[in-house]
């Protein structure tokens, strides 16, 4: 059963906050529990085991810290939709709340931590251990799957993960990109419109995709070597 952040003792909350920052910065395996406890200002070296049972329990608590706020915003977007929503509207309902309800500093911490979770399997990912908190996300995913009845569910979920990855990376890169000397993204709105459209574009790819990597393997060989390609414009070897 999931547990809200405010239900933890004060010391446990300090550990959760420190863990989000340190896991995001160093990775789930790049920082020791002892270092986290020290960073949280706690003196008991067994504090993680005391409050969370294990490292996995701590990761779960970090994930659940911001989940209720983000999920409530997702539910509000779902409530405002009609029954004929587009994939763009569904993706927006899933991603936009992150930048709408979390201040810049907190959403950067959130994004860095969430990026560390992306490689985890379903059995390891904390999302699947707190589905009672994540009903809006589950509903959004269900509707996304319904939009692509001819695609296998694993293909759709892979594309969703790629879209989420793009958006989270956009949060991580915002400060750097907005400071580029070209000033290509003069306003925050322009930047986020761009990031969102990049994320959305993964759903427009055909399946099966056009062959590229497999096509190279099947090219005819001359004397045991593949023929060199020439640049059409200059004739130079590529």
List the model feature ranges, each with a label.
Residues 22, 29-57, 61:
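Helix-turn-helix
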Residues 134-238:
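C-terminal peripheral helix-coil segments that are non-catalytic and often amphipathic
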Residues 14, 89, 93, 109-116, ...:
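Amphipathic alpha-helical interaction segments
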